[in-house]
């Protein structure tokens, strides 16, 4: 059977009942997923604008300063991981298939490192192993993916590390930035504590 909900609310449907979760979460600033699958979503009667507001990692958000998406993505994925660990049985396994790198205005950010740091920092998961794979896209470019295997450790771990992790990645990115790009990164760091997660999408908001 299929159950539809915001990923950050998964535990409300599947609490402590799952042995294995395999998923490929969104990446920072890559697609607007609701647009890529718009035709299907409209056939099913979903409200596209409500879905768009809650989408994780969307490049549509924060158009005035896209580096704020790095922070919002980290917060959203922290909430998602906190929900998924509560879905898993003790020692259950979570496998994340992650596009290794995203670019925001030409500045690279490691999706894999951000997610792994969030997963391990709050004590919810232990890393089991990581693998990598590569494929050639239609433009002839090599695309690397990391396969991160995590074991559920603590369903009640406190998840409060995402802001600090985002801050460190943004600070590190300044070494590759200049001009207005560097200015936007610096501005994001200065307001980082005021950036909120994406709004949760309730079941009522889907249709």
Cite the ranges covered by each PLM segment.
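Class I S-adenosyl-L-methionine-dependent methyltransferase catalytic core
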Residues: 1-95, 99-207
